Structures are given as C-alpha cells and as structure tokens.
Curated annotation (Swiss-Prot):
GO terms for cellular component: extracellular region. Residues 1-34 are annotated as: Disordered. Keywords: Secreted. This is Non-cysteinic peptide Bs 10. Residues 24-34 have a biased composition (Basic and acidic residues). Residues 14-23 have a biased composition (Basic residues). The keyword Iron does not apply. Belongs to the non-disulfide-bridged peptide (NDBP) superfamily. Coiled coil: none annotated. Expressed by the venom gland. It is found in: Secreted. It comes from Hottentotta tamulus sindicus (Scorpion).
Amino acid sequence: VTMGYIKDGDGKKIAKKKNKNGRKHVEIDLNKVG
C-alpha cells in the first residue's frame, strides 16, 4: 500500500491511499479525522 499527501483545491491536506491493485484511491480529509 502506498500513501501520499496532497492538497486539494481548497488547500486542505488530503491523504491519497492506493488500494492493492493501485488503480483506485481513497481520499481522506485529515482536517476531519484528526
């Protein structure tokens, strides 16, 4: 699992997590989760 951090258009920090096949990703709003 690879994980990278980007900022979205509003400047919020977003964690992009690729799943096992590496095609899809889950975006997590870090401001909401902690």
